[in-house]
């Protein structure tokens, strides 16, 4: 019996080390950033069982077998749709400003289509204004409404949007609603999901959280887009979830969330529609390719509106494109660069690009919330401040709530707005969307919004920053080491 237990013990020990060696080899064989690989190896060697389980759960990008098959199956028809769209030459911009030219070329080469012109844009910075505009557009809808949000939190004006959407469905408007399973857990536990389905709305719970399938698909891969398309002509996107900030996370101690949304009319709705079509097919298996732009209702003269490129990210979309776009925009800056983000955990390449811009004389400003709803990201962000300040970057800490806006403005002409945070999760993992706008008028509007944020912020003093307590520095470095995993 003693011999039996000895053999079993040795087999367990052998299996244990074989498992660690196997996972280590897999990490080394994967083409990932060195900091990310080192962080995973550290976790595995310090806490082997926890580290191995964590890596197998969230260490690699697994969309899931069924969704991966759907993603592969949809691309031939999607590619044909994109190719057919090129015949509508009147919607595509032929030239761009000098500051935007490189970025638009990058997007065209990687996504297969050029930026679209003739769009009308309106920036909305107040949640009530966003929801009131959305309700009006829903009430005037004639054919179809598609929505996707990371969070739908019942309460306040969000309920009024829900009521208007159900009323639209009852008058035979085709309504589709896709919500992330994790972000909208409160919605799916409420009566609203059943009420909407009973009204005729197609409600889809995207990327369902299922602990039984934790090793088959990444549970932290989330549908983070916020988009609305109405009649293939009107579109919304930006940082705002379908929540009333007066009722959302009031116990988090960070104040009301501050967001920015763009309301658009024009062919950009078609570009966003194909993104929604891909998401819908990956999640449901149903194909809903949008119709081509209607030349009878859309103006396409270059001078009549804004030129926009839509960048979509996530499994099945051009890999690393949003990261490349941010790098390209940063290196294109000649006069000034302003960034706003709630979560700042940049890649080494993006951090280097930002610091280099400041060191070559560009006026670089980053606006972050002073209080963050994520303790981990809040501390990790602080670990980058010393390097940024040393390079001459101005860091503004917003004090008017949790600044949730994601925006970049380059030289007053090139703008990026959407759902992408400047962190690893947004850059390489989640389903995200960003608008790239080449227009001085829109740039002036965005600059006014950012100036308002700065007026409600405190400029971080580099001299005081270096005097912060030692325990804060140690905590920052600890979270910095794990920043590639956040």
Curated annotation (Swiss-Prot):
EC number(s) per entry: 2.7.8.-
Matches recorded under Gene3D superfamilies: Endonuclease Chain A (3.30.870.10)
Keyword Transmembrane (UniProt): yes
GO molecular function: cardiolipin synthase activity
Catalytic activity: 2 a 1,2-diacyl-sn-glycero-3-phospho-(1'-sn-glycerol) = a cardiolipin + glycerol
Residue ranges of the TM segments: 3-23, 38-58
Alphabetical list of PROSITE patterns matching this protein: PLD (PS50035)
Protein's cellular compartments: Cell inner membrane
UniProt-recorded name of the protein: Cardiolipin synthase A
Organism lineage string: Bacteria, Pseudomonadati, Pseudomonadota, Gammaproteobacteria, Enterobacterales
Encoding gene per record: clsA
């Amino acid at each position: 019996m003693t011999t039996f237990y000895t053999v079993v013990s040795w087999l367990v020990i052998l299996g244990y080390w074989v498992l660690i060696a196997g996972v280590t080899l897999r990490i080394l064989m994967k083409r990932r950033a060195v900091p990310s690989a080192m962080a995973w190896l550290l976790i595995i060697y310090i806490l082997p069982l926890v580290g191995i389980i964590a890596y197998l759960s969230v260490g690699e990008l697994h969309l899931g077998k069924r969704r991966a098959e759907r993603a592969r199956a949809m691309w031939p028809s999607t590619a044909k749709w994109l190719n057919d769209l090129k015949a509508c030459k009147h919607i595509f911009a032929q030239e761009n400003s000098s500051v935007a030219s490189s970025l638009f070329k990058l997007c065209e080469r990687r996504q297969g289509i050029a930026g679209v012109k003739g769009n009308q844009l309106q920036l909305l910075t107040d949640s009530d204004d966003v929801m009131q505009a959305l309700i009006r557009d829903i009430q005037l809808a004639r054919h179809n409404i598609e929505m996707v949000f990371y969070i739908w939190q019942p309460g306040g004006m969000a309920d009024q949007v829900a009521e208007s959407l159900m009323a639209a469905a009852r008058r035979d408007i085709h309504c589709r609603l896709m919500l992330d399973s994790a972000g909208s857990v409160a919605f799916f536990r409420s009566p609203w999901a059943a009420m909407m389905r009973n009204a005729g709305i197609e409600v889809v719970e995207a990327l369902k959280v299922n602990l039984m399938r934790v090793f088959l698909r990444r549970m932290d891969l989330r549908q983070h887009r916020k988009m609305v398309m109405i009649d293939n002509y009107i579109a919304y996107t930006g940082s705002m979830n379908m929540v009333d900030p007066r009722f959302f996370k009031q116990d988090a101690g960070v104040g009301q969330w501050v967001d920015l949304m763009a309301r658009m009319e024009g062919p950009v709705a078609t570009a966003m529609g194909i993104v929604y079509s891909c998401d819908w097919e990956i999640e449901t298996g149903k194909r809903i390719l949008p119709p081509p732009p209607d030349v009878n209702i859309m103006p396409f003269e270059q001078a009549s509106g804004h030129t926009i490129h839509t960048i979509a990210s996530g499994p099945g979309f051009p890999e690393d494109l949003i990261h490349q776009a941010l790098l390209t925009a940063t290196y294109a800056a000649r006069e000034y660069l302003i960034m706003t983000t709630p979560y700042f955990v940049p890649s080494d390449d993006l951090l280097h690009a930002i610091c280099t811009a400041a060191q070559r004389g560009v006026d670089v400003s980053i606006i972050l919330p002073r209080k963050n709803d994520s303790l981990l990201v809040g501390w990790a962000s602080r670990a980058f401040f010393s390097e940024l300040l040393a390079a001459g970057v101005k860091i503004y800490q917003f004090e008017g709530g949790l600044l949730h806006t994601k925006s970049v403005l380059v030289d007053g002409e090139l703008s990026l707005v959407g759902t992408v945070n400047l962190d690893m999760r947004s850059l390489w993992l989640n389903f995200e969307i960003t608008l790239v706008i080449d227009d001085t008028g829109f740039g002036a509007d965005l600059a006014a919004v950012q100036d308002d944020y700065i007026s409600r912020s405190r400029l971080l003093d580099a001299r005081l920053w270096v005097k912060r307590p030692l325990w804060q520095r140690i905590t920052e470095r600890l979270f910095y080491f794990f920043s590639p995993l956040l």
